[in-house]
Amino acid sequence: MVILSNGHQWKYSEFLDNKDYSFDKDQILKSISKDEIDDAYNSISKWEGYAPTPLILLNKLSNELSLKNIFYKDEDKRFDLKSFKALGGAYAVEKVTKGDKDIVVATATAGNHGRSVAWGARRLGLKCKIFISEFVSKARGQAMADLGADVIKVKGNYEKSLLECIKQSTDNNWQIVQDVAWKDYMLVPKYTMAGYSVMMREIVDQINNEKITHIILQAGVGGMAGAMIAGIARYLDNIPITIVVEPDSAACVLESIRTGKVEKIDIKRESLMGGMSCGEVSLVPWEILKHSVKHCISLPDDDIGNTMKLLGNSSFSDQKIIAGENSAPGVISLIASCEDQNIKKKLQLDKKKKVINVGSERDTDKKKKKKLISQ
């Protein structure tokens, strides 16, 4: 391997097969219906500034790993937010407010979901309250404030910020627009996921009837992964091998699939993959993920900065790709899997295979990126 031949070993922490795997399209579409998926695409595709984000061929990496094609869905180009999250929170704001300008929307976020809600609120002329944990960088908080949101920092982690959001929203009669589901709060996260599924519609249009064999999906609370799998059930004729990747410090989907029930992770160390550092899978995506994810992979933070650098200097493709830390895990897990011959064989990765990765965001925190790629 030319690019990867410097003796560096690409690492994964754990690889898990889903013993309960059964990809049932009809069952998946009971969680998010065809109509909900179609409504999201029909609405979002009419928004000002909408355009499908690029599907970039990582031709150099494909050759290195002896795969037919590796594609990278580049969400750096998504509206002004430069993240797939623009599809979810903003669409949910539109759905729940129904043109009522007096509604105040609120959410808790690790960054990009809050930016989407703030952007969606500004787009509709609404007031917006954003709750962030103390671990969210100053740059990410400022990005939401720049969109007109009132940003409230909460001591503790993401879960603490969510609890404070729920408390203050209940006290003040604000409308919570969250991407996390819990008992009696399912509809808004479904709207958010329906928005995310637009990516899968675009991919289907972009691959020109090529058969995708594998798709690697990042998971925090599982919303994007569940949405993309719902999109597969809606739009694809074949069923690709579905792989979820998470930080090893917050592998809540992996642990839940291991036991067959929702498991809460006590996060001892915050991952560099901040938007994925979540301790509990959301209920709506869990109903999809528990049977339709074939394999789970957890990763350490070791290769995040290097992967961002290699994407950015055209090592993996003919294009320079501006990637954030949450865009790197899919590529890392694919390289690490190909370097482990047992895993490569189990995943059936060979010269005929075509793999989708989701480049979920650009470098929304440039100071953090500079530090990462210099290490």
Task: Describe the predicted segments one by one.
Residues M1-Q375:
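PLP-dependent amino-acid enzyme catalytic core
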